[in-house]
UniProtKB/Swiss-Prot annotation:
<dbReference type="InterPro" id="IPR033656">
    <property type="entry name" value="HisRS_anticodon"/>
</dbReference>
<dbReference type="GO" id="GO:0005524">
    <property type="term" value="F:ATP binding"/>
</dbReference>
<keyword id="KW-0963">Cytoplasm</keyword>
<dbReference type="Pfam" id="PF13393">
    <property type="entry name" value="tRNA-synt_His"/>
</dbReference>
<dbReference type="InterPro" id="IPR045864">
    <property type="entry name" value="aa-tRNA-synth_II/BPL/LPL"/>
</dbReference>
<keyword id="KW-0547">Nucleotide-binding</keyword>
<protein>
    <recommendedName>
        <fullName>Histidine--tRNA ligase</fullName>
        <ecNumber>6.1.1.21</ecNumber>
    </recommendedName>
</protein>
<keyword id="KW-0436">Ligase</keyword>
<comment type="subunit">
    <text>Homodimer.</text>
</comment>
<keyword id="KW-0648">Protein biosynthesis</keyword>
<dbReference type="Pfam" id="PF03129">
    <property type="entry name" value="HGTP_anticodon"/>
</dbReference>
<dbReference type="GO" id="GO:0005737">
    <property type="term" value="C:cytoplasm"/>
</dbReference>
<keyword id="KW-0067">ATP-binding</keyword>
<dbReference type="InterPro" id="IPR006195">
    <property type="entry name" value="aa-tRNA-synth_II"/>
</dbReference>
<comment type="similarity">
    <text>Belongs to the class-II aminoacyl-tRNA synthetase family.</text>
</comment>
<dbReference type="GO" id="GO:0006427">
    <property type="term" value="P:histidyl-tRNA aminoacylation"/>
</dbReference>
<keyword id="KW-0030">Aminoacyl-tRNA synthetase</keyword>
Length: 494
């Protein structure tokens, strides 16, 4: 007789696109974020925690680099008919908070936020539906000093978590400069911003693909179009060769110094008022960073930074890790970007009708943690707690007292709470917990007022082939007076 479907046991499995985080994954991420938070705190930023759930209306259209930002969320309709969704980033909740509490918050408002976000997108290798973000934003300041501060803070954050100078670079660009270039190229009319909007969209998407398509592919998209390897044709912006040359010149404008780069950009933007304003902003940012000691070894003006230019309205920044790693096929490649941000106006305008400038940065937490592991700054096997074993069930109070003493001394310790019948299983448990030391006291040791400390780390080394001399110089098991338990464990751990 077939079992009733209602009685079928549920499958114990993680939903597609999600993952579970255990022990070291959690502690390493927390340690990294704590270090970043300390930098943000030092810069005067306050923490903000918002609900994981927002109204779909409040989420709005703040997701960068996606043509249809209202799609791809985990949403549902509540009993009142309101549509709710899990937040897909940390910027949209900030927009709502800045509008809702605008009369209570200081202006400018400086906040940082860290936490998971959710996107209902097709999962793939390294692409999950839940991931962590770490943002810092200044809301309410139009000064480019706020942008310079974000760049400096990002540089400090990378260094404090273990990315040394020389292994990263923060690159700065400006959307206004690109707009000036497009004005010179004839695809932006300041008196009629809607004119050539479609062409500008194609230009932005084309230059954003420079790393993947190369100069030839981008030139094709700026012109009539491009046919890919599969034969699919993508329509281009329809720019002439002269117009395309102006755009490509913008992307190749970086020179050896910030001043030389700015001079080249001024040539490209010509008489464009907006373009000249953007160049001036880049010069000011470079000057403000220079007086603080952030030289070109850490932060540079680089017009080749194009990611996010379709979203941001002014300065744009990207942190790129420059050291090499091996990909899944064993080939060397540069690690790449781990953070990005920029200035975006009208953060709360759709809520209040008032224009509010803002600038900020978002760190890809999982990517940065992967970078630290690649550099050997994270991913090391975490040490477990000292395990106090149980030899006599009727002496649990004695064992609990030992655990308490170790904990009060600041040591991580736990009492074995499984079935104590098989002592071998207790040591296997300690090994599984990566415990460095096991504390043992049977009735004989208790009568003599001693405890036995088993050095599990040394024991593993001996099992792996330590020399006889090493074994003799440091025995893997020692007997110490019960009163010296804490000191002896501390010595063994050191």
């Amino acid at each position: 007789m077939a079992k009733d479907k209602a009685s079928r046991r549920p499958r114990a499995e993680t939903p597609k696109g999600f993952r579970d985080y255990f022990g070291a994954d959690v502690t390493e991420r927390k340690a990294m974020l704590d270090a970043v938070a300390e930098v943000y705190h030092r810069y005067g930023f306050d923490p903000l925690e918002t609900s994981a759930v927002e109204t779909v209306e409040a989420l709005g259209k703040f997701l960068p680099d996606v043509d249809r930002p209202n799609e791809g969320v985990f949403g549902w309709q509540d009993e009142d008919g309101d549509w709710l969704a899990l937040r897909y980033d940390l910027t949209a909740p900030l927009a709502r908070v800045a509008a809702q509490f605008r009369n209570d918050l200081p202006s400018p408002y400086r906040r940082y936020a860290m936490g998971p976000v959710w996107r209902n997108e097709k999962p793939g290798p390294g692409r999950f539906r839940q991931f962590y973000q770490c943002d810092a934003d200044t809301v309410g300041s139009a000064s480019v000093a706020a942008d310079a501060e974000i760049c400096a803070m990002l540089s400090d954050a990378l260094e404090v978590v273990g990315i040394p100078r020389g292994d990263y670079i923060v690159r700065v660009n400006n959307r206004k400069v690109l707009n000036g270039v497009m004005e010179v190229a004839g695809v932006l009319d300041p008196s009629d911003p809607a004119k050539f909007e479609a062409e500008r969209g194609i230009v932005l998407r084309a230059i954003d693909k420079i790393d993947r398509l190369g100069e030839t592919g981008v030139r094709a998209l700026l012109g009539s179009g491009r046919k890919d390897e599969s034969g699919d044709f993508t329509k281009g912006a329809g720019l002439s060769d002269e117009q395309a040359e102006v755009v490509m010149g913008f992307m190749a404008a970086r020179r050896d110094t910030g001043a030389a780069t700015a001079a080249r950009l001024r040539e490209l933007v010509g008489a464009s008022t907006l373009g000249c304003e953007g160049v001036q902003e880049l010069e000011t940012i470079a000057e403000l960073l220079d007086v603080q000691g952030y030289g070109p070894d850490r932060i540079v003006v680089d017009p080749s930074v194009v990611r996010g230019l379709g979203y941001y309205t002014g300065p744009v920044f990207e942190a790129e890790l420059t050291f090499e790693i091996l990909d899944e096929k064993g080939r060397k490649r540069q690690f790449g970007s781990v953070a990005g941000g920029g200035r975006y106006d009208d953060l709360v305008k759709r809520f209040t009708g008032q224009s509010v400038p803002a600038t900020g940065v978002s760190i890809g937490v999982d990517r940065l943690l992967a970078a630290l592991r690649a550099k050997g700054r994270a991913g090391a096997e975490a040490q477990g707690p000292v395990v106090v074993t149980v030899m006599d069930r009727d002496r649990m109070g004695d064992y609990m007292a030992m655990v308490g003493e170790l904990r009060r001394a600041g040591l991580r310790a736990e009492l074995y709470l499984g079935n104590p019948k098989n002592f071998g299983n207790q040591l296997k448990y300690a090994d599984a917990r990566k415990s460095p030391v096991a504390v043992i006291q049977g009735s004989d040791e208790a009568a003599r007022g001693v405890v036995v400390l088993k050095d599990l780390v040394l024991g593993a080394q001996i099992a792996a082939g330590a020399s006889l001399e090493e074994w003799k110089s440091r025995p893997a098991q020692v007997e110490v007076p019960r009163a010296d338990l804490v000191r002896a464990v501390q010595d063994m751990l050191s």
